[in-house]
C-alpha cells in the first residue's frame, strides 16, 4: 500500500498510524504546495513553468534550496506511472487546499485504472482559518485515533479527476478549497492584504506576514509564499524592505509602505 502525504510535517503522525515497517516501504511525501503558483504544466515534465515559479519564490537567503528542476518532474513521472504498478494507494488529507489538490491529482492519475484508491480524511471539512485542520496539525497519537481509511467510490474518483482537469485549465495562480470545490484566482487578493496591513511606519515583516496568513480562508498561506509576494511588492515600489533577511529569510527584515 502506498501512503501519500503532502509535506514532511505529516510524516511522523502517519508513520505512527501505519507503523514503521509500512512507512519504510510505502510512505511517499509530495512536497509541492499545489495551492499556489501555476499548475498548467505540473503533470508535464520538465514542468518548466512550475519549476520557474518555485525557483523565483524560494528566498535566496534560505539555502540549500530544493532542487525543483529535478524534484517536480520526478513527482510528475512517478504519479503518471502509478496506474502501472500493483499497490493500492491511500491519500491522507485534511482541509488544506494543497492536500485536497493532491487527492484530486491522484484520482486523475488513476482515472482509468482498476487500482484501489483509499483516503484518510483528517480535517474538519471546513477550510476557514479558525476551524481547518491539516494532517500535520494533529499530534501523532490523535491522528492514529481518528484515522479511518475508506475506499474512494468510482463516482467520487470521477468527480475528483474532473476537478483536477478543471484546475489545470483555469490558469489560476492561487487555488482555494471551499465547500468541497476549488476556485482559482491571481495574486491580487493576497497582495491587497499585505498592503492593507502595512503602515507608513516600519514594522517587522514577520508581523505583516502573520496578518496576511491569518486572514485567508480556503488555503494555508505559507511564509515562503507570502514572503515572495512581499518581495514582489517591494520590487514594484509598493513596499519598502530594510534590514538583513536573518532566520527563515525574513526574521531580520522590516517593512513599510512605499
Q: What are the language-model segments listed below?
A:
Residues 1, 25, 85-88, 115:
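Short coil/turn segments at beta-strand junctions that form active-site/ligand-binding loops
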Residues 1-70:
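A structured, charge-rich N-terminal accessory region that forms the first stable segment of a protein
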Residues 12-17, 39-40, 99-106, 128-131:
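A short acidic (Asp/Glu
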Residues 22-26, 105-117:
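A short alpha->loop->secondary-structure connector
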Residues 26-35, 115-127, 223-225, 242-245:
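A generic structural motif
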Residues 59-104:
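Long, hydrophobic/aromatic-enriched structural stretches that serve as scaffold segments
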Residues 131-203:
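A conserved mid-domain beta-alpha-beta active-site/ligand-binding segment of alpha/beta enzyme cores
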Residues 171-258:
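C-terminal, charge/polar-rich interaction regions
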